[in-house]
UniProtKB/Swiss-Prot annotation:
The chain crosses the membrane at residues 136-156. One of its GO terms (cellular component) is host cell membrane. It is a single-pass membrane protein. Its main location: host cell. It is found in: Host membrane. Keywords: Host membrane, Membrane, Transmembrane, Transmembrane helix. It comes from the Viruses. This is Uncharacterized protein ORF72.
Length: 188
């Protein structure tokens, strides 16, 4: 069951995460700002790179919430942390939740804080990755560049060597003007 990108409902608020793991310190100086995202009505946001059992703080709408365990809830979004592996999250999710078939999950896994992967819960209760926001944009960009290359190639093949090319046309007009003497005589 795939989830269309248009199903994403972005909440215009950010959560500031400060984790105890080296991941946060080495990658972003100890603080990472992400956008808490709600997907339809039932959603889980996986915050990977946060050490299991370690405390980390979340600021939401300038209100700091201290969290020593997970899951916790922000604006009806369930947030689960403590893993960087989808298989590890599968077992964690089963122990914390009763997964619903078709529930959409936004995964902010290690290295993908700014490139969240989208997954859905399958019939067996596991997660299946169905897409990435940035991957979709990259595909569209590559398609556009490929189209531009084709257009330039066709133009170069059929028009650049033709007598009607831009340079040849200007040369022809220039020679005509010289032979006629002035621009007005060109049209007589």
């Amino acid at each position: 069951m795939a989830t269309d990108q248009q199903d994403l409902d972005i909440i215009s608020s950010t959560a500031e995460l400060r984790g105890a793991c080296d991941f946060w310190e080495t990658r972003s100086g100890g603080v990472t700002t992400i956008t808490i995202t709600r997907i339809n009505r039932d959603a889980i946001v996986l915050l990977a790179g946060v050490c299991p059992g370690e405390s980390f703080s979340v600021s939401y709408n300038k209100e700091k919430i201290l969290v020593n365990s997970y899951p916790f809830n922000i604006n009806n979004v369930d947030v689960v942390g403590g893993t960087t592996d989808i298989n590890d999250f599968n077992s964690k999710m089963k122990s914390l939740y009763l997964p619903v078939n078709g529930m959409t999950v936004l995964m902010l896994t290690e290295g993908r804080i700014n490139n969240p992967e989208i997954a859905v819960v399958t019939e067996d209760g596991n997660l299946e990755v169905v897409g990435s926001k940035k991957k979709t944009l990259v595909k569209l960009l590559l398609l556009f560049l490929s189209l531009m290359v084709v257009i330039v190639g066709v133009w170069w093949k059929y028009f650049s060597t033709s007598e009607l090319s831009a340079s040849a046309l200007f040369d022809t007009v220039g020679q005509s003007v010289k032979s006629k003497g002035n621009y007005e005589d060109l049209f007589k």
